[in-house]
Swiss-Prot record:
Inhibited by aurintricarboxylic acid and Zn(2+). GO terms for cellular component: cytoplasm; extracellular region; lysosome. Belongs to the DNase II family. GO terms for biological process: apoptotic DNA fragmentation. One of its GO terms (molecular function) is DNA endonuclease activity. Coiled coil: none annotated. This is Deoxyribonuclease-2-beta. InterPro entries: DNase_II (IPR004947). Hydrolyzes DNA under acidic conditions. Does not require divalent cations for activity. Participates in the degradation of nuclear DNA during lens cell differentiation. Keywords: Endonuclease, Glycoprotein, Hydrolase, Lysosome, Nuclease, Signal. It is found in: Lysosome. Its EC number is 3.1.22.1. It is an enzyme of class 3 (hydrolase).
Length: 356
């Protein structure tokens, strides 16, 4: 057998043997401890003024078995939250050090006072074996701690709203993810990638070892498919692509007008943009399902939805803000046409800024 057919046959052989060998089936997990194809969360901001008394630990939850947001049964700092349940697989992988890999990245590393501008403005983690795994993309600085510390939610993550998306993926998707990470160059602060993955995955092991010498593309767009067949588009930009990812790329590629929620500090924001065929509008207030509306500057999440008059209903969740400085940073967004994801995020829009 030649090297190329052998390379193609190895993952299939591993999947066939996994049931016999007891390989764990890694996935996104809900609060009941059950595997789901995907879930989204929206952590609400801390509220101390009239109309809201939240501690900044409540979150909205939506997964592949649901049609709209529900209030979480547990606080986000609980190990019984959807994040806590899902990350339990990370801690098991760390303790076992067997054939399960993980990679954790954040431009704001836990237990550090410094924010890294040398890597992507991106936050997330991946856990996988040769059967499947999950990719969690989120907006929470300093999360999660290194695996040996177990599950903790940072106190700094309470003040503002945060968002994230977890997708369960077959191992066949990880070569594509490997190429996407090369583009946006995340700041990896904890990782373990056994040698068995180096047949197919080139860049993640190199980045894990801080030794990547591969040429970085300006940008890359690819299709990812969840374990149950839901298609996603992933946009990844490097520092060589210096335009606003929303206005210059995502809106024009999807051919939709976008309503964008991102962290926009005063005097550091990009205004709504109607100069291109497809427009981008900044969301200015969020309609809180469990509390009164709150302004966009209380929201650290990064997401967008197409306007209702667009021909397609898209939702994107990811890494970057609409600001001049962020146009120079690398990062990405993952987008879906799932109707329930769209409807749930669209209902959060209270009002947005027009170009006038």
């Amino acid at each position: 057998m030649t090297a190329q057919p052998l390379k193609a046959a190895l993952p299939l052989l591993f999947v066939a043997l996994s049931g016999v060998l007891g390989t764990p089936v890694i996935s996104c997990i809900n609060e009941d401890g059950k595997a789901v194809d995907w879930f989204a969360f929206y952590k609400l901001p801390r509220r101390t003024s009239r109309g809201g008394t939240g501690m900044g630990l409540d979150y909205l939850y939506l997964d592949s078995t649901m049609r709209t947001w529900s209030k979480s049964h547990h606080l986000i700092n609980s190990s019984r939250s959807s994040l806590g349940r899902t990350l339990e697989q990370l801690y098991e992988a760390h303790n076992a050090k067997n054939d399960t890999a993980y990679l954790i990245y954040n431009d704001a590393v836990p237990a550090s006072v410094n924010y890294s501008g040398n890597y992507g403005h991106a936050k997330g983690l991946l856990v996988w074996n040769r059967v499947q795994g999950f990719w969690l993309i989120h907006s929470i600085p300093k999360f999660p701690p290194v695996p040996e510390k177990g599950y903790e939610y940072p106190s700094s993550g309470r003040q503002y709203a945060q968002s994230g998306l977890c997708i369960t993926l077959k191992y066949s998707q990880y070569e594509t993810i490997d190429s996407q990470l090369l583009v946006f160059q995340p700041n990896i602060y904890s990782c373990f990638i056994p040698n068995i993955f180096r047949w197919e995955l080139i860049h993640m092991p190199q980045m894990c070892a801080k030794s990547s010498a591969s040429k970085i593309p300006s940008r890359r767009l690819t299709v990812l498919q969840s374990a149950q067949g839901l298609n996603f588009l992933h946009f990844a930009k490097s520092t060589f692509y210096t335009d606003d990812i929303f206005a210059a790329w995502i809106a024009q590629k999807l051919k939709v007008h976008l309503l964008v929620e991102s962290w926009q500090r005063k005097n550091h924001e990009l205004p709504s943009n109607c100069s291109l065929p497809y427009h981008v509008y900044n969301i200015k207030a969020i309609r809180g399902p469990l509390q009164s509306d709150f302004p966009s500057h209380h929201d650290h999440s990064k997401w967008c939805v197409s306007t209702k008059d667009s021909q397609a209903r898209w939702t994107c969740i990811g890494d970057l803000n609409r600001s001049p400085h962020q146009a120079l940073r690398s990062g990405g967004f993952i987008c879906s046409k799932n109707r329930y994801i769209y409807q749930s995020f669209d209902r959060l829009v209270s009002h947005y800024a027009s170009c006038n």
